[in-house]
């Protein structure tokens, strides 16, 4: 098993299990020997038929081409295949609690470094759709960059105080009945100081936002990252298809970023303060 003993996988699994009671996000993603052995042909066939059904696919073709020739060839190819009727995709019916399942979890590994993840269980964004939802997501992109990015007060403080020796990172995931933010570092020397600083920021994020000038810098950084997607056809096609699946238009995104104001950042910061927190720690017990 190439994943079971991998530190990053271990802390990710701990975080998911600590955040959620019932959401399938907490379930095993990669699997272990025991769970894989239970997989049957019927399971694989059901997944294949759903995943590759035309009603569940978005095809994005990027590059210089004759659009009509390309799509004619696609239609010809697909018409030769036999598909069942359109498969209706249903969300699992479950209720997720507002609280986190565990506020703290810890384990140890045979490594010489400590991994720490501080995760925030947010209110899901299910009530927001299209452009409105995309704007909220991008506002959080900027907010998190201001609070925990490479140029943030947090990162400078952690490096100066030798809490860690290299910048870690942050991420967020937003799906049906699920929205969480995670700040993590995989080489923490002082776990208590690292966790305390993140919790202090979460309790009063406005204090750490610096000013509107810093906001404009981070906003331009997000715009630059978006424009850079055009330089990589693989990333571009992935971004377009992901947005289409969420009923969003890729070509609206730049204007959405431009429309974000400092007041939008403050609103998201207020929501961030309401999050429920869980801390996951993987301690290294090996000395170099």
Residue ranges and their predicted role:
Residues 1-6, 50, 193, 200:
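Active-site-adjacent, His/Asp/Glu-enriched structural segments that form or flank metal-binding
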Residues 10-34, 56-62, 117-125, 155-207, ...:
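M16 family metallopeptidases and their MPP-like homologs
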Residues 15, 118, 130-148, 158:
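Active/ligand-binding-proximal structured segments within catalytic/core domains
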Residues 21, 29, 34, 53, ...:
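An aromatic/glycine/proline-enriched structural segment found at the starts
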Residues 36-40:
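Short, charged, amphipathic alpha-helices and their helix-cap/turn boundaries
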Residues 74-78, 143, 194-202:
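Short amphipathic C-terminal alpha-helix that caps PH/PH-like domains
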Residues 261-270:
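Low-complexity, intrinsically disordered Gly/Pro/Thr-rich segments
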């Amino acid at each position: 098993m190439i994943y079971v003993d991998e530190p990053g996988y271990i802390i990710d699994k701990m975080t998911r299990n600590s955040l959620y009671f019932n959401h399938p996000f907490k379930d095993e993603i990669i699997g272990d020997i025991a769970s894989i052995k239970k997989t049957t042909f019927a399971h694989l066939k059901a997944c294949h038929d759903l995943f590759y059904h035309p009603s569940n696919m978005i095809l994005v073709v990027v590059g210089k081409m004759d659009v009509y020739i390309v799509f004619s060839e696609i239609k010809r190819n697909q018409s030769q295949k036999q598909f069942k009727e359109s498969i209706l995709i249903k969300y699992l019916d479950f209720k997720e609690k507002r609280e986190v399942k565990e506020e703290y979890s810890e384990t140890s590994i045979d490594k010489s470094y400590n991994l720490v993840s501080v995760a925030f269980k947010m209110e899901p964004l299910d009530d927001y759709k299209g452009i409105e939802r995309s704007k909220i997501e991008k506002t959080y992109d900027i907010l998190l960059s201001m609070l925990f990015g490479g140029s943030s007060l947090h990162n400078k403080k952690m490096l100066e105080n030798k809490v860690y020796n290299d910048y870690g990172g942050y991420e967020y995931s937003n799906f049906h009945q699920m929205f969480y933010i995670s700040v993590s570092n995989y080489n923490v020397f002082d776990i208590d100081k690292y966790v305390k600083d993140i919790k202090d920021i979460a309790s009063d994020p406005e204090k750490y936002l610096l000013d509107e000038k810093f906001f404009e810098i981070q906003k331009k950084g997000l715009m630059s990252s978006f424009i850079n997607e055009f330089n990589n056809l693989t990333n571009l096609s992935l971004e377009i298809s992901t947005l289409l699946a969420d009923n969003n238009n890729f070509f609206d995104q730049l204007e959405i970023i431009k429309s974000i104001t400092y007041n939008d950042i403050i609103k998201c910061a207020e929501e961030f303060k309401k999050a429920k927190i869980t801390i996951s720690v993987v301690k290294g017990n090996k000395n170099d």
